[in-house]
Amino acid sequence: MEMEKEFEEIDKAGNWAAIYQDIRHEASDFPCKVAKLPKNKNRNRYRDVSPFDHSRIKLHQEDNDYINASLIKMEEAQRSYILTQGPLPNTCGHFWEMVWEQKSRGVVMLNRIMEKGSLKCAQYWPQQEEKEMVFDDTGLKLTLISEDVKSYYTVRQLELENLTTKETREILHFHYTTWPDFGVPESPASFLNFLFKVRESGSLSLEHGPIVVHCSAGIGRSGTFCLADTCLLLMDKRKDPSSVDIKKVLLEMRRFRMGLIQTADQLRFSYLAVIEGAKFIMGDSSVQDQWKELSREDLDLPPEHVPPPPRPPKRTLEPHNGKCKELFSSHQWVSEETCGDEDSLAREEGRAQSSAMHSVSSMSPDTEVRRRMVGGGLQSAQASVPTEEELSSTEEEHKAHWPSHWKPFLVNVCMATLLATGAYLCYRVCFH
């Protein structure tokens, strides 16, 4: 397959960064005037990730129709997506208003609520304990009907009710839960299986409104999801995988929302996902067998994502740089969620990824041995501290053995005294 050869050549030459920069320079740039209005500042998660004016979703509100979301229409593929940022606490109602007004049936979430100690998205759907949430600002109620937790994703069945008309609709919430922080999955297998589960639900069909896709900024992982889906759809329609140019498709999508695909690594992963998906479409038995294994959805996580070991139980007072965490408010220990321009997005993610890789690689067996030695040393030190009883018994023992300690010294003194006295007496007798 031509695309696979292209991938291998780029990989061998290490040209992903250069190709990514070319895409960035060729990408369209359109005005975002509405997003920059002062009244909309608190509706943007990142100050420099904004929807273009010509493709932004407009809410049916008289006072303010703004939401940080873009409609992406891929004509040949006959596919439409709404890409949006992770909802903020003050925009959760707007998010569900958009879902209602656009008649969307599915929501795809590609991030976790908390990542790297930073809040990436508000909790905009009810959890098991709550069962329902009411959004008074938009007159909507959301109820959790069921939750199906798989090894690398979760599917939630939600009911969205318009409190004014009492009309209800079923919404499917597809939550991919194993995308590594500041990186990409090692293998596209589980990601593609997740994509095909979304397809099978009918949420992407023309019978419904555009599917809503989000991560944190709504451009990186979200762009990867939509790019892979569109390319695979075009391959299937054309019956010629080699005719699909991923770079060209991405540039077309960037006409509707800025910054889709944030890093060179995400671009590389998109190629991998499309190549793997194309093999499945073309009937590659090895790929199909692998996907059958994933489809069993047993309790074991796929090999590409093994979670870190559980953290030890939290101590009452945990020192941090000479301070105790519990003496400070919790927000002081969470990095501030800000984001500069698209360059800084990529740089920040790249730095975090490289530092994460460095920290993982530096966790050598020697490090673990040293940690255990330090722990053992502390335990030994604690064990060697005598108790009060031990101290008192030791003192008594010293008192009991006092004569035995001084006896040799006293004997020597007495002997020396006797010898000196004898010598003196001999001297007196002999010479006087």
Curated annotation (Swiss-Prot):
Keyword Membrane among record annotations: yes
Entry keywords, A to Z: Acetylation, Endoplasmic reticulum, Hydrolase, Membrane, Phosphoprotein, Protein phosphatase, S-nitrosylation
Location(s), subcellular: Endoplasmic reticulum membrane
InterPro entries noted in UniProt: NR_tyrosine_phosphatase (IPR051985), Prot-tyrosine_phosphatase-like (IPR029021), PTP_cat (IPR000242), Ptpn1/Ptpn2 (IPR012265), Tyr_Pase_AS (IPR016130), Tyr_Pase_cat (IPR003595), Tyr_Pase_dom (IPR000387)
EC class (word): hydrolase
Domain of life: Eukaryota
Principal location class: endoplasmic reticulum
Annotated signal peptide: none
Region (Disordered): 297-322, 335-399
Chain positions with Phosphothreonine modification: 367
EC number: 3.1.3.48
CDD domains reported for this sequence: PTPc-N1
Chain positions with S-nitrosocysteine modification: 215
PTM statement from Swiss-Prot or TrEMBL: Ser-50 is the major site of phosphorylation as compared to Ser-242 and Ser-243. Activated by phosphorylation at Ser-50. S-nitrosylation of Cys-215 inactivates the enzyme activity.
Any single Gene Ontology cellular-component annotation: sorting endosome
Positions of modified residues (N-acetylmethionine): 1
Domain Tyrosine-protein phosphatase: 3-277
Membrane topology: Peripheral membrane protein
Residue sites binding substrate per the record: 181, 215-221, 262
Record-listed Cysteine persulfide modification sites: 215
Catalytic activity: O-phospho-L-tyrosyl-[protein] + H2O = L-tyrosyl-[protein] + phosphate
Binding partners and assembly: Interacts with EPHA3 (phosphorylated); dephosphorylates EPHA3 and may regulate its trafficking and function. Interacts with MET. Interacts with NCK1.
Protein name: Tyrosine-protein phosphatase non-receptor type 1
Native source organism of the sequence: Mus musculus
